[in-house]
Amino acid sequence: MIQGIIGKKIGMTQIFQEDGKAQPVTLVEAGPCVVVQVKTEKQDGYEAVQLGYGKAKHITSAVKGQCRGFGEFKVLREVDVDDIAAVNVGDQITVSDFKDGEKIDASGVSRGRGFAGVVKRWHFAGGPKTHGQSDRHRAPGSISSTTTPGRIYKGKRMAGHMGNDAVTIRNLVVLKTDAEKNLLMVKGAIPGGKNTIILIKKTGK
């Protein structure tokens, strides 16, 4: 059985539980995906399947050959598989392979925030608002010492580009599936904004 699926983030909403509490949920349009390649231990050194998702506007000859006539896919991703012998090129993967209450890991690209200061990027407290301060309210403070070490240590938290990173959130719960509309309703938040490509894998797979 294939342990993942590719989808697109639709957005967030909320549902009300039996006790009346509101539960934030994320809607993901997952699949249908097509198996475009099966990788085996003998030929590739490991077992996995490559899935294709979405229709591409433009596609190179190399990718077209890789898709093997099953379509011009916008996204290609590899996922694990339990029984490689049961999977064939051309098989379709849909949300019906997931069950309500099942735990998943969701991977995507977080929303880009551009160039951000240390208060927004790293949650620094900033300087005091009074006692003679005029332009130090959101400043980083000291970033290193003097002659020794004479440099800034690697990994020092400073202002810079924020967001647009690959992020994986683990142990999310599938609350509901809709096979007709290819929808997964996932408890909580998933990385990225609307229309972000999301790779969903079953937790621990």
Curated annotation (Swiss-Prot):
InterPro entries: Ribosomal_uL3, Ribosomal_uL3_bac/org-type, Ribosomal_uL3_CS, Transl_B-barrel_sf. One of its GO terms (cellular component) is cytosolic large ribosomal subunit. Keywords: Ribonucleoprotein, Ribosomal protein, RNA-binding, rRNA-binding. The keyword Ribosomal protein applies. Pfam families: Ribosomal_L3. One of its GO terms (molecular function) is rRNA binding. Residues 126-150 are annotated as: Disordered. GO terms for biological process: translation. The keyword Ribonucleoprotein applies. Part of the 50S ribosomal subunit. Forms a cluster with proteins L14 and L19. One of the primary rRNA binding proteins, it binds directly near the 3'-end of the 23S rRNA, where it nucleates assembly of the 50S subunit. Belongs to the universal ribosomal protein uL3 family. This is Large ribosomal subunit protein uL3. The lineage of its organism: Bacteria, Bacillati, Chloroflexota, Dehalococcoidia, Dehalococcoidales.
